[in-house]
Amino acid sequence: MKAAVVEEWGRAPIYTDHPEPVARDGGVVATVEASALTNLTKGLVSGKHYASGELTLPVIPGADGVARLEDGTRVYTGALKPYGMMAERTLVDPDGAVVIPDDVDSVTAAAIPNPGVSAWMSLEHAAAIRPGDNVLVLGATGVTGSTAVQLAKSAFGAGRVVVAGRDTTRLDWLRTVGADDAIAIGTDDLRARVARLHAERPFDAVLDYLWGEPAEQVLDALGTSELAARYHHTRYAQIGSMAGLTMTLPAGILRSAAITISGVGLGSIPPEVIGRIRAQALPKMFAMVAAGELQLGVEARSLTEVERAWTAKEPSGTRIVLTP
């Protein structure tokens, strides 16, 4: 069969021949229809991701995707090691698959789960969003951030959602799908805007997809605002690091305000919670997509273009999906 194959850590995969998968240990061979080119997929084969050690080269990338089982059922699933989803066929566990409704196409269905499940875990588990909560989404213009904005309002009942990001066109669009206010990073004074909004109505939760300097400014605003003298608990969920892998956090910030910081990733959420969210929330999100209540930009490309797609800059707010 044809597949995308990574032969060296950190290098783009090549489109080449690969041995067919063989059914074993409860896994069945399925025909792949689509697999999203996500940051997780790229990170795992970079050799630098904290889960890269579980892989052995050469490897077929593709953490998850849409496949068709032998009986014709179309499902969202992950591939069983050592296979990935960026191939014509792969090995899957049918018991862990989620059936895709007929009114959601395979490309969209492949794009939704990664940002959707991540956003849902962040909202439910780390940020613990409750109806009426005041939420700040830092780095909201990306695929996962914009998904979180929509779910915060429509699925979790957030009372106010403030979005922050650099792409002003995307910020304007986010106002049409649930955002109540927007902060343009690089144009607005991020720290001052967050401090003022926090003083007017304290943030119950922050979803941070950036880290780095923007996170420093936000945490400084939360920790040194006029509210520092009054107790209000803010749940800070750290999800991404698009603006930097490190940041400086003065100890005084954590002592001057009730801020709880927790991470969202493969090792920070209990496996049973991840499994439950995939099983219960994905069908809800597929239904929301079909009803037009959850929107995500997608761009389909042939798997034959994997080398070019891998190194190309992803359009803002759009997820590239590869199809065999």
Residue ranges and their predicted role:
Residues 213-291, 324:
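Glycine-rich phosphate-binding loop and adjacent beta-alpha segment
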Residues 61-64, 75-141:
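NAD(P)H dinucleotide-binding glycine-rich loop of Rossmann-like/cofactor-binding domains
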Residues 76, 206-207:
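N-terminal Rossmann-like NAD(P) cofactor-binding module of classical short-chain dehydrogenase/reductase
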Residues 20-37, 48-84:
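Glycine-rich beta-strand-centered segment in the early N-terminal region that forms part
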Residues 1, 272-324:
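C-terminal hydrophobic helical "lid"/dimerization subdomain
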Residues 112-188:
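Mid-domain Rossmann-like dinucleotide-binding core that forms the NAD(H)/NADP(H) cofactor-binding site
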Residues 189-201:
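Short amphipathic alpha-helix with an adjacent loop that forms part of the alpha/beta core around
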Residues 86-87, 165-173, 246-251:
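Short, glycine/polar-rich helix-capping loops at beta-to-alpha or helix-loop-helix junctions
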